[in-house]
């Protein structure tokens, strides 16, 4: 028997602490326990505002990086639990209050619904008349989340399955809650564990993305695809066998190559992968029957993603001494004009979670906006392309989420600069060089923004003026002086020409949106050019881009550049400026730089985020209005298969020019001036919500009014000075004192920062809910 000499044993690293924080509901039950001043209890009404501001700002609770990291990690599990409870509610409503069963049998003829209004005081008028007319015992209010389409795509066919999933989600939520408690109170990771980025990358890439995609591929092949095959074969949803994917013989009926005598695992291990091409395809484009991406293409896509990410998850150096070191790569990343390059950024990203979060938010926000565009151009779920209310809802939702995430990136980048930036470790690296060039960067960005603003808006003003003067020939328009978006058309042509070429000889086109060909206008579309489903509704069609698109895209550019200008200025000037050299000492948010320092108000990093939110709102509003009008005018509608005609939701506009009539889509003809946007889009399309009272859409009319009120209420906070409110409060307190009914907690007016926070929150809530009501009343009124 031999023993290993002691000196040769590798010491085991303990990466967790046992029982670091006792579980104490008594302590947590005391409001403000996490901060010394708050724990004393309220003296003034400011206390409740500070409670909200600081509850999740862990860095104000402690300066211990390890403790902060553990709190964030634990909170992630709590967040996942909340998401699972929320999803459980979705499944529960789908199981017990929806018309999912009926919708599955007639997805093109019914609108999804998962809630019905009881007949109290006539409120049942809110139930969708088509649902009531068809004699459904369940379902009433139309839902536009796309969940029914998603559920059908992934293999749900009965409400019993939805109920089981609802219970499963609650169980998963409970497990996440337990994990959050366990990893903070019983086995809490050490700071070293959080800073081990190579191991984290390997596990996230190979585990979460790689194996996650592989598991999903398995689900698609063994559950979703056989369910779809049975539905396509005419089997009633209630009779579909959800376990067919586990029966080799049954699968062989639907996929004879992959599950035939020469298929299965044998084909996999002998590298005869061509056998799998009946369920792992590369068809490209959309399935004509459903208007959705081919499910076999989606399975193939996820298998490819899984392969790539599992490989990527083995790239970084951990215990084995092979692979990349992030620190070495960053420090080697320098060029002839970049000084020290990325040296020091490893320390930044492993000691500042704000810096890491800022990068992740910027990427996640951008990806979410890309998702918004993919959802309509390459609709992933069956029959969703013709559910226009759902399509506009999903586009708007993803655009808003993306906008908020990107503003959040600016916020956390600024917090990093104030709280975590170390000038000593960032000497002549790219971060330091950007900060030293900040005046040039911001002034150039400012100039570009002004140029964009005057020129893009100037095109619209020019057109309004020419129209008012009766000179249509002098307008910038497809019918007069065209401004063709040549770069966008070039990108369209690249995508249209790619399939069948040398680069992709086997691939079909990704979407009909690219195939504009000789299309001179959306008004000339024919039925054979669009993808229309069995109910003759258009799912997607070629999208013609012209002068109107060129103009509005320059408005997008203006709005995006202003948003970036505000956020980037907030980040680059977060620590100091000529006006306030000691800004870093004042913190992330401060109202002004004290008395006698006029002109220093609204210059904190927080105030830049505050202003950035308004411009983000402007940006997203223009984008979703453009999308709504363009799709109704140029894409969505119906086809007449007997004549080959395409009838868009909004009919074409005849433009009279020099005695000749030119037919254009309404969007191409009207959106080229401000008057057109106000009259033909906002005013014309708001008729549905304004006239909704007394019908099933009346809830949206009330929401439209209420949201306008919330928006107007915000102006009271945004336009007023704090002094006015404090004086008003003092006089009310005086009256209470006279009557000896003064409260124990002294009333205080909101601080300047609190007032702005309340203002922007109500401004955005009011604006978003107004847009929501405007869109849904319009789209649900359509047949």
Swiss-Prot record:
Enzyme class: oxidoreductase
The keyword Ribosomal protein belongs to this UniProt entry's keyword annotation: no
Native source organism of the sequence: Gloeobacter violaceus (strain ATCC 29082 / PCC 7421)
PROSITE patterns associated with the record: PHOTOSYSTEM_I_PSAAB
Catalytic activity reported: reduced [plastocyanin] + hnu + oxidized [2Fe-2S]-[ferredoxin] = oxidized [plastocyanin] + reduced [2Fe-2S]-[ferredoxin]
Binding site for chlorophyll a: 716, 724
Name of the gene this protein is made from: psaA
Entry similarity comment: Belongs to the PsaA/PsaB family.
Protein name as annotated: Photosystem I P700 chlorophyll a apoprotein A1
